[in-house]
A protein has these predicted regions:
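Extended, aromatic/histidine-rich regions of cofactor-dependent oxidoreductases associated
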Residues: 1-160
Length: 160
């Protein structure tokens, strides 16, 4: 519950705003582990992200049977425009059905149905694109604090 709001006439100097919530001032705020000499800036926005919530790594899914995959997504600092799902390790993507839009900062439920055509190991992926066109990247965003990590999540399953 919100108890009070404090309005400041200058930037806050508490630990969280002056030291903790900071990322490298470089494209995508990503650096290599061990890199030094970059300027840090405050985190002022968030990045789109999507999760698969009803299928776990190692699950066995039936071949040639309809499979429902559910999840959630958020657009970061704006709304969710779309979520796409891949059943072939990101080689192809299909649109996902989105649940109600409860506002630009809310989580959106999502679901999609698919049929696995053959047996074997499969990688399921979900990729969110927000309303300003920013999509989750396929590469990891790494920085010393771990903020703004939004790489496309992978769920490894076995088709049987």
């Amino acid at each position: 519950m919100l108890n009070d709001i404090e309005v400041l006439s200058k930037p806050d100097t508490n630990y969280w705003t002056s030291t903790a919530y900071r990322v490298p001032d470089v494209p995508n705020h990503t650096v290599k582990p061990g890199d030094k000499g970059f300027r840090l800036i405050p985190v002022t926005s968030n990045a789109p992200r999507s999760f698969i919530t009803n299928v776990q790594n190692g699950d066995k899914l039936k071949v040639r049977a309809e499979t429902l995959v559910r999840g959630i997504a958020f657009g970061g600092d704006c709304g969710v425009a779309r979520v796409d799902t891949s059943i072939d390790d990101g080689k192809s993507w299909q649109p996902t059905q989105l649940g109600p839009d409860e506002g630009k900062y809310s989580l959106r439920q999502r679901q999609t149905q698919f049929t696995l055509p053959a047996g074997g190991a499969r990688t399921l992926m979900a990729r969110c694109t927000n309303t300003v066109g920013l999509a989750q990247p396929s590469f990891p965003v790494w920085n010393p604090s771990g903020y703004l990590y939004n790489t496309i999540e992978s769920t490894h399953v076995i088709a049987t």
